[in-house]
Amino acid sequence: MGGHGFTVPVLQLGDVLLVTLQGELHDEMAEQLQQDITARISHTRVTGVVIDISGVEIVDSFLGRVLAEIAAGAKLLAARTVLAGMRPAVAITLVELGLTLPGMRTALDVERAMEMLGVTTRRGEGSP
């Protein structure tokens, strides 16, 4: 495949896939990510996808479209998508571009996104 040597980590936490985007996502990587997530949903039968964009400083119309397409594909496979950690500047850019990301809910951080999908992430309770 591409010679970038960089892949976007996709972790499975129970019934949820956690995708963490960092820095700039090139077109080829974004399209590969879309295929990877769709395949993982299909094979693992997860019910939710959390896309953490707290490490993304700039969103263009292409990335916005890819995020919307990931959410649409997930929905067709009976999984809900939550976008987590959006920076204020990214939110403003999406509005200016007219990208409302239909079918995708948003959360302030990954912990809240997981809770929206019914996964409890209680910290500080119990042992160590």
What are these regions (language model features)?
Residues G2-H4, L13-D15, H43-T47, L76-L77:
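Short flexible coil/turn linkers enriched for glycine and charged/polar residues
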Residues G103-A113:
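Short acidic-hydrophobic, aromatic-tinged amphipathic segments that line or gate anion-handling sites
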Residues M1-H4, V119-P128:
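Intrinsically disordered or compositionally simple regulatory linkers and C-terminal tails
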Residues L33-I37, A78:
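Expand to "…catalyze enediolate/carbanion chemistry for C-C bond making/breaking, isomerization
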Residues V90, L97-R105, R122-S127:
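Conserved glycine-centered short motifs in functionally critical loops
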Residues M114-G118:
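Short, charged, surface-exposed secondary-structure boundary motifs
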Residues T44-T47, I51-T100:
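Amphipathic alpha-helical interaction surfaces in cytosolic regulatory modules
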Residues F6-Q34:
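STAS-typified acidic loop motif
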